[in-house]
Amino acid sequence: MIRIALIVAVAAAALHAEGTKCDRACLQGFVDSYLDAMAGHDASKLPVAPSVRFTENGKEMKLGEGFWRTAGKSSYRLYALDPAAGDAGAQAVVSEHGEPAIFFVRLKVKDQKITEAETLVCRKGHAGFFAPEKMTTAPAIFSEKVPDAQQSARSQLIRDASAYFTAVQTEGTPDYKEAPLAPEANRFENGLQTTNVPMMGQPAMSASAQLDKGLFKGLLIDHRRFPVVDVEHGVVIGLVMMHANMNGQKNTILISEMFKVVGAKIRQVQAVMVNVGADAATGWK
């Protein structure tokens, strides 16, 4: 009798776990629901945990405040989905008072409830690069599955993305460490292509060549986090705080970078970034 009861209990637990698991379609649905609810200025439409945490540009707020009060519909969505961790991230272009804003959201889902919502909002004039008009169609490469032979383990994908940030921070110094970039790799910052095109008075260079030359020398990167990792598609989201000293003026930038990795080489980087105050925080550990 005890054995039967134990079997029933185990089966019930398994069914409960299966019922609360959020697969790729489920996670994307949460992202879409978030963007749609935000466009309607009604956070009550979202299934959230009582202890849900929400930040906007590093500041903790009550869900429904900030951009929620002014955001309109989105015209572009690029997803990164991590069923293993229950995390999802997306980049979007969102209308605000008739003007486009570039938006990033990361959600953590547990037991079919949103427990964390981390967002970045970049408006015109709040970043060095701002080209939402170029963000019309999500790049197909991020939705392509990586062949089994070229897939990397979760830990390796994180190392590859972190190595990129190390290269950016050490470029132009004796401690420079190369990033695992594919020869054809491209980087886009707030919609603008910043590799293989003339930049900062320099001729067109590959992503690797820019770093080798130390084109962005003097950047400090901290608070690295990699909460979203999609092994099947080779996609990693890295979140960092970057400190720059350009022409004697200090600037702090919150950045979300979405990496596409194939065969242990980064093939594309899509970044959303926004300038914040010198005393800013990420809002997350």
Locations of the language-model features?
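Hydrophobic h-region of N-terminal signal peptides that target proteins for export
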Residues: V8-A17
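C-terminal and inter-domain tail/linker signature
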Residues: H16-K285
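Sec-dependent signal peptide recognition
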Residues: M1-V8
